[in-house]
Regions:
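Glycine-rich phosphate-binding loops of nucleotide-dependent enzymes
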Residues: 1-178
Length: 178
């Protein structure tokens, strides 16, 4: 029997930033996936705002305000900034029986949210693959916050980034925490 996590206790308060460090195979990814609702703990409990919580799926974690940004970012390089920002949660317009994607509103929201973090998206229809690694990371974080994340779990948010891009991402993380 493999014990991936043992005696893990974490307490986070609003605005806090916590960094989890450990060797390869130490259980960091398992903890992240447990907090994200991918894995269920065999024992122990997850307590959020004083309530014991069980996640049956990643959607349950999202519904509780836990937004996870994985190392691969879950972005589609050939899709636009706007499409990647909304990813299945697009704003809709029209009558209830014939709703369509409100691209104008979506473009406006995506550009505004990216602008709030200092990234000028002149054309929200541009492919995400044309953005720098730091800009893509900030897009993924901004998306999680926009859709209600109270707690952001970031899996290696600066890996494979240059010094300037890593600095941009870390500044945004600090800004998001405040």
């Amino acid at each position: 029997k493999v014990i991936a996590l043992k005696d893990v206790t974490m307490k986070l308060k609003k605005g806090e930033i916590m960094c989890l460090l450990g060797d390869n195979g130490a259980g960091k990814s398992t903890l992240i996936k447990t907090l994200a609702g991918v894995h269920k703990p065999d024992e122990g409990e997850i307590v959020i705002e004083g309530e014991k919580t069980v996640f049956d799926s990643p959607k349950d974690a999202l519904d509780m305000g836990i937004g996870t940004v994985y190392q691969d970012l879950a972005l589609v390089p050939l899709m636009s900034v706007t499409r990647n920002f909304f990813m299945g949660r697009e704003p809709l317009k029209g009558p209830p029986f014939l709703k369509t994607f409100d691209i104008e509103k979506a473009n406006q929201i995506a550009a505004e949210r990216m602008g709030q973090i200092g990234i000028d998206v002149r054309d929200p229809s541009q492919a995400v693959g044309t953005m720098s690694g730091g800009e893509r990371q900030c897009l993924a974080i901004s998306r999680a916050i926009y859709f209600g994340a109270k707690v952001l779990v970031l899996d290696e948010p600066t890996s494979a980034l240059g010094v300037h891009q890593a600095s941009m991402v870390l500044k945004y993380i600090v800004k998001a925490a405040s």
